[in-house]
Amino acid sequence: MKKMLMILILILWSFSIPAQAQELKTPVHLRIAAQDLGSAWYVYGASFGKLWRNVLPKGSTIDVLPFGGAPANSLLIEKGDADLAFSFTAIANWAVQGKVAYTKRINVLTGLVGALDRYYLAAIATKRSGITSLEDLAKKKLPVRLVSQPVGSSGEFSMRLLLEAYGMTYEAIKSWGGSVTPTSTGVAQSQMIDGKADIWIQVVTAGHPAVSELALSTDLNFLPTGENVIQKMAEYGYEKTVLPANVFKGQDKEVPLVGFPTILIAHKDLKSEVAHLLTRTIIENKKELVKAHSGFKDFLPEEAWRFDQYAIPLHPGAEKYYREKGMMK
């Protein structure tokens, strides 16, 4: 009788083990496309890797690729050079739709975890320039000196779209006697400090280190995005958002802007049980993630499944987890 009872207990116990724990017996080798060493996304990738190594089978490896960036990361997945990648909602949507930064549709992308943080498309002017709005800049055709991120980056594409929404182009600004210089974060910051640039248009987080440092040495105006421009930018997947007051020195008022969250995407051929486990581990460890990087304080696990609004298909393994948790009906 006791023997039969023990057998019954073992059978019931085996059914209680999550499916992915039973199926994942062999090591998993994953590559996650992030960004340069020291970037927020590289830290994100390292943080995820640390959590995943604790739950994946012994011998599993996770390589965080120290290159890429939002537009490039989708291509790395398509080429088979990465299994996972960070992107922004708008830019992943461009990849799926084959527009803006992409000449054709990328059909292998799926979503795992969204709403990881909050990025803002900020236009930051030095006070000495006297510029208080991009609308004023367009109307007066001022010979402004603009800096942004390198060509092909999310920041440079975003600057181009933002200027176009205000009726400006790079060529027009140059014809007014101004300049447009896509460059590195360090060079852009230095040019703003040295008075060689008037406006820096950049995709930033709240408390972005380079902008925070700039605000300590240079008086700045954080230019608001007009409501009509916000609506135009929405056509490209940007969301209406607000930079809270006092995030940066001298920025004592809320600033209406557009922006987007970081998302984790994966190749559609990633095994379902792996996708399930990776998703579960991130969703259930927000506290640990916040310890690793402050950007995760804006992570919204309850919204992480909402890829439908960006026309990005959800990976079946991730969808299974969200339905099990009652997040999706």
Feature names for model-found ranges:
Residues 27-55, 60-64, 121-194, 308-317:
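Bilobed "Venus flytrap"/periplasmic-binding protein-like clamshell domains
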Residues 17-21:
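Sec/Tat signal peptide C-region and signal peptidase I cleavage site
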Residues 6-15:
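Bacterial N-terminal signal peptides
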Residues 89-91, 99-101, 111, 125, ...:
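Pocket-lining segment of extracytoplasmic ligand-binding domains
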Residues 73-120:
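N-terminal segment of the mature folded domain
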Residues 138-161, 240-308:
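Ligand-binding clefts/hinges and TM-proximal coupling segments of bilobed small-molecule sensing domains
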Residues 194, 199, 204-216, 222, ...:
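An extracytoplasmic/periplasmic, membrane-proximal ligand-sensing/linker region
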Residues 1-4:
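Positively charged n-region of N-terminal signal peptides that target proteins for export
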